[in-house]
């Protein structure tokens, strides 16, 4: 199965899928799925965006995609980031927020199906670590606190069988960054995500949030941190064999281009 993992896009859906298709062309493949690590930019109403989003790129492309009912060019699974309309996501019925765009809720898993060879299981914990909210139940969080994941969400996942990929927004505790806005050598303190990897033993973990490309090994699991949209290291391609431990990194998309065929 051919999978493209993508970093934070903050509403730049047009650019994401332009780059995904260009990446396919460069590799000479067609992706079966796109996996997204959160900060997708789910803002159905541009008037509801949070302060950080308002100060940067605004609501982005999602409101128009939603209004027009656009179809994701490739089946896409995403977890929430820390900049989304959490109330809208919580109240949304069903898996798909748009045709082909699947929201993987915290503490849940989804099977990526291949009609010829079976399925690959993806487990997800979106949002970022918040020390003051971590011990609360997820259904107790209100407003902007919903950007945080909670211990009970992790506990719902730890006994899930046969997980191949873990998709998180924040970096598992222990991931060290050579370059980071908090300074070189910054180490993630996102509790619980490292424990989740210890229990699930997936083949690989993808994360975003920190807007930098980084590789790490946590609890014996390969962890790949992805850069933000339009930056080198935003897209990574892997091939994963169903029913085995085999997977390989096919390449990374490094070209930075302007414009969009979806504008």
Set out the residue ranges of the language-model regions.
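Core catalytic region of metal-dependent phosphoesterases/phosphodiesterases
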Residues: 6, 13-114
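Conserved beta-sheet core of the metallophosphoesterase superfamily
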Residues: 75-79, 94-99, 174-246
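Active-site-proximal loop/helix segment associated with metal-binding centers of metalloenzymes
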Residues: 115-183
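Active-site-proximal segments of metal-dependent phosphoesterases and phosphodiesterases across multiple
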Residues: 41, 47-66, 161-201
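A short C-terminal boundary segment appended to hydrolase-like catalytic domains
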Residues: 242-263
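Active-site neighborhood of phospho(di)ester-bond hydrolases with catalytic His/Asp-centered motifs
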Residues: 5-7, 33-39, 74-83, 104-105, ...
